[in-house]
């Protein structure tokens, strides 16, 4: 566990407290810590309430989108959501190339961001998980309805670093012609 473990939850049920004691640590980032609960759901505990408000608000607004995990509970300081398994896009690209199916999913994801009315049409490669069936799930949405970023800058940067940006853009150009 990090030396910076500065989280606290108030007014949690005894069942949730027990579940947390039995949970497996999945990871810790700048904004929170995530555990896998025994019921195969994930709980994210946030450091700052402002980040919790933003992420829980986004996940509630996008609840019908297949690209985001289902949210089960959002109470001050934490979110219980669907566990997202799979391979992070950045790690996937280290092992292999971007294929047409994955290009299509990434393109559909960007179109979904626009459909959802996001002002921030951007996501980091490390926040995109490739599922066994090659669909995508996104974790850690941030500022999607607040900050204006009109193109997927972080995604493009990640694809460029792995020499895959041209392949993706060529696919998009080809599909847009149709």
Language model segments and positions:
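ATP-binding glycine-rich loop module of kinase domains
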Residues: 2-57
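Short beta-strand
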Residues: 27, 70-74, 120-121
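Conserved structural core of kinase catalytic domains
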Residues: 60-63, 67-103
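Short hydrophobic-acidic sequence motifs that mark active-site Asp/Glu residues
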Residues: 34-36, 42-44, 68, 80, ...
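C-lobe/activation-segment region of protein kinase-like
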Residues: 119, 132-178
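Conserved kinase catalytic-core helix
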Residues: 90-136, 152
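Juxta-kinase regulatory segment immediately upstream of eukaryotic protein kinase catalytic domains
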Residues: 1-22, 158-178
């Amino acid at each position: 566990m990090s030396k910076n473990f500065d989280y606290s939850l108030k007014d949690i049920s005894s069942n949730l407290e027990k579940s947390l004691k039995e949970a497996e640590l999945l990871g810790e980032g700048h904004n929170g810590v995530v555990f896998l609960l025994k019921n195969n759901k994930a709980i994210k505990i946030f450091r700052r309430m402002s980040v919790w408000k933003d992420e829980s608000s986004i996940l509630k607004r996008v609840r019908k989108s297949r690209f985001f995990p289902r949210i089960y509970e959002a109470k001050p300081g934490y979110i219980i959501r669907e566990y997202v398994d799979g391979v992070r896009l950045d790690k996937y690209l280290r092992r292999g190339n971007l294929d047409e199916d994955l290009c299509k999913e990434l393109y559909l994801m960007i179109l979904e961001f626009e459909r959802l009315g996001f002002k921030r049409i951007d996501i980091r490669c490390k926040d995109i998980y490739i599922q066994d069936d090659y669909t995508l799930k996104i974790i850690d949405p941030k500022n999607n309805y607040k900050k204006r970023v009109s193109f997927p800058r972080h995604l493009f940067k990640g694809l460029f670093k792995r020499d895959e940006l041209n392949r993706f853009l060529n696919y998009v150009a080809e599909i847009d012609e149709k």
